[in-house]
Curated annotation (Swiss-Prot):
Molecular function in Gene Ontology: ATP binding; magnesium ion binding; phenylalanine-tRNA ligase activity; tRNA binding
Subunit structure as annotated in this protein's UniProt entry: Tetramer of two alpha and two beta subunits.
Principal location class: cytoplasm
Binding site for Mg(2+): 454, 460, 463-464
Biological processes, Gene Ontology terms: phenylalanyl-tRNA aminoacylation
Protein name: Phenylalanine--tRNA ligase beta subunit
Pfam families tied to this protein: B3_4 (PF03483), B5 (PF03484), FDX-ACB (PF03147), tRNA_bind (PF01588), tRNA_synthFbeta (PF17759)
Gene name as annotated: pheT
Domain FDX-ACB stretches: 710-803
PROSITE patterns reported for this sequence: B5, FDX_ACB, TRBD
Free-text cofactor note: Binds 2 magnesium ions per tetramer.
Top enzyme class: ligase
Amino acid sequence: MKFTLSWLKDHLETDASLDEICDKLTAIGLEVGHVDDRSSLKGFVIAKVLKAMKHPDADKLQILLVDTGSGTPVQVICGAPNARVGLVGVLALPGTYVPGLDVTLSVGKIRGVESFGMMCSQAELELSNEHDGIIELPEDAPIGGLFATYAGLDDPVIDLSLTPNRSDCTGVHGIARDLAAAGIGRLRKLSLPKFVSSFETPLRVFLDFSQDASLCLGFAWREVRNIQNGVSPQWMQQRLSAIGLRPMNALVDMSNYISFDVGRPLHVFDADKIKGDLRVRRGREGEQLQALNGKIYNLSVKDCVIADEEGVVSIAGIMGGERTSCDEMTRRVIIESALWDARSIAQTGRALGLVSDARYRFERGVDPAFMETGLEVATELVLRLCGGEGSKTKIVGYQQPEIKQIAFPFSEIKRLTHLEIEREQVITILTNLGFGIEGEGNVVTVKVPTWRPDIAGKADLVEEVMRIYGLDKIEPIPLEGFAEAKGQVLTCTQIRSRVTRLALVDRGMREAVTWSFISESQAIAFGGGQAQLKLVNPIAADMSVMRPSLLPGLLIAAQRNADRGFPDLALFEVSNIYEDDTPEKQQSVAGGIRRGTERFEGAGRFWDGHTRTVDVFEAKADALAVLEACGLDIDKVQIEVGAPDWYHPGRSGVMKLGSKIIVGFFGVLHPAILERLDVSGPLCGFEIFLDRIPESKKKATKSRSPLKLSPFQMVRRDFAFVVDKVITSSLIVRAASGADKKLIHSVRVFDVFEDLSLGEDKKSVAIEVAIQPIERTLTDGDIEALASKVVENVTKATGAYLRR
């Protein structure tokens, strides 16, 4: 929100300096983003060229004698092609700082001829990039006068960074109101004209809505005829130019000016270009509008528009159309002042990519009680600038806004701020801000002004009082000290999340944080997409459903890195997934993926040439590392087939505890899933459900039991079993381990062999059993007895026989 200092003083009677005003604005919550005081232009004067002579030693230079109003001509050397006798321009005298050159002028010689100043271009004054010639001013410009004053460039421009809730400060009058309440001057009341009109406009306006009446809560219009649309006055042009708007003509400039002056967006139609009646309605598929910015916009049924019998003439509340725009030939206009739905304006603006000052104000909310008054202000300004006569005002669809009332106990200020503020001071602050106060005692009724839609409750009123009283007066209060917590502070899930992160980082993986919402197609591919998990207002079309798995986000992140030259990587995330919208179905999960050659041992090419890509075993090892870090005995984990469809059916597994508890999945990602997500492999991944891991029954302790190592040598024996192909290796390992849990240290598969010589649908699985004596060295008989027990257990569990 930009405005000039003189503009502010039209609404605020004050002697405060620019610095005092800016400091107070920031203090009351209206942050000053930038101030352009343009003090660097104060030393430039208006001068007229009296004489122009060719430089004796330079073909492209001239010796100018210029009149500065002092009575004594000044000699200046100039190389501008447009320098000539009679030209009125801008002169910088010695001692003047030239911002475009970043130099301070002094008397100097150019090719042997002294120069006592410099005729300036727009680029040298940083007014534009134009540097081909010096500035040319009208002949009636005051010779010797200050250029900054003449051009209106001595008026500081203040730029506020408004928060979205302060719609009341999108006009200079609202800003002045806040400053007056804060003690910076006195608020000047708006001059609200009233007209006695002699005729009625024949134009009719219809609100063509069925159940969408909230799209337009009121539409007021008035016709003004017999006007002359010329240029706007210089003071208005200077103010509009200062805030970055290009002056066009009196009618356009008037509507822009009122939008910034009192925060009331308007639109002016050329009445002779309107065909028939106006209708406010939804857009229609295939409709287009060439807007005032020259661009053509394709409209839809989601857009609110104003249309006549020939089609759309305006995108409601955002921008008008070229067909009904006003020009120098306009003689009859319709001034429109309406109330548009903030949400509809915001949605249409985003969909069309159309930004305007009107949209900026309507999507934040304008004062509903100022709709007709704003029309009166606009009419008065049109009559003053363009002449003519106005019709009676017509209004459709408007109802007086209901005044919001809040029961406000003065004790609420002490409760929220720990400050004691006098009752009368609180009432004065709220009254100066436009609030109405009724009642006596410690609880009063506060009537919220219609221009403050952001005030909803008692806390908002406390905030209003405090930002005017002074937020800096709130003394810091140290946090209350608490005794040291006894017992476990972190929850089980928090502890598991922490140790999981450490374990996966130790395995060379990098943590990622991805969005909790993904596209509907991705969610369906990973078993989700339920209706109750769809977002009502997604931030993007491809982020519309809560994720059922961590893998989609990690896969997209991996592909994004691969596209940027990092194909080998390992990512993990510890976060939540969602099965439905109940708290019980929000699960804490650790998920990870590896891509390319990013194995635990490293990535990329090796000197021996044996570069291997990631496979199911990397994913399995990562998953087991998580389970082990969470305190689970991984020897109890059963690995079976039957992973979800997004895994490769022959290169994946399910991790179970017993027959029912599934604690995770791992494997190579299915090629069809990768193609569906437009992701390239090789890729493997895992998912561990942290909430499903049983809590350890061991009592937590900071001390560790001493390491006990056996002094006896470990014995290893190999066994090769012939089993059916459907038998998993994990079943054989568990059966062998159960032969003697005290002596058997580990069981490991080291070979799988398939051949017709073994029989149809048969395979050979070779295991190594490590036997660790504890109390004494085992005899051959002990070892043979244990070996027989191993064979017996495996045969009983799987139907295998020992391969000879």
